[in-house]
């Protein structure tokens, strides 16, 4: 795909190293953005297939938009809806420091979840996540790549789906209309 957008530019010489670096960064950022959106689309398909009620990019406080809000933004904005039945899931191909963004996306939700494909996150970062009440969700086969002390705190995707289903099964159906 990058060839389509950048072939002409690449075949001509760059005016400077800065121009080359700027172009390389644009290409990398486009790739990262596509990978992130692809991950969100795959998760969305999985959630639909599992009959979960959710909304993508629902607006919360200060126009913030978590990747996934269970059950939806309408329930989130309804002060009568039990906050303990709201679930927020961020989706990041890699965490780095961007995991902190998930913490600020929905004030009504105490414990937030982050799905990632990144393996082997450091103990220090896992401790920070735990202390910030953020639970990692990863593919089941990735759990063994994390420090043993934290493996029990990490959910696999199936466990996350079952948790959401359990919460949603006990909610009155009028919330989903």
Indicate residue ranges for each PLM-predicted region.
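Catalytic core segments in nucleotide and nucleic-acid processing enzymes
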Residues: 41-44, 48, 53-177
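Interdomain/boundary linker segments immediately adjacent to catalytic/signaling cores
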Residues: 1-37
């Amino acid at each position: 795909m990058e060839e389509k957008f950048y072939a002409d530019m690449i075949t001509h010489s760059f005016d400077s190293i800065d121009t080359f670096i700027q172009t390389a960064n644009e290409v990398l950022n486009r790739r990262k953005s596509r990978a992130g959106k692809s991950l969100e689309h795959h998760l969305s398909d999985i959630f639909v297939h599992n009959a979960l009620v959710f909304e993508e990019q629902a607006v919360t406080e200060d126009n913030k938009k978590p990747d996934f809000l269970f059950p939806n933004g309408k329930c989130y904005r309804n002060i009568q809806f039990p906050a303990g039945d709201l679930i927020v899931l961020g989706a990041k191909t890699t965490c780095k420091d961007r995991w902190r963004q998930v913490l600020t996306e929905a004030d009504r939700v105490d414990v937030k979840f982050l799905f990632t494909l990144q393996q082997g996150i450091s103990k220090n970062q896992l401790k920070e996540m735990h202390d910030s009440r953020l639970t990692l969700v990863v593919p089941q086969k990735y759990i063994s790549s994390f420090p043993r002390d934290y493996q029990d705190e990490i959910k696999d995707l199936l466990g996350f789906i079952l948790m959401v289903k359990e919460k949603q099964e006990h909610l009155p159906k009028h919330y989903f209309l």
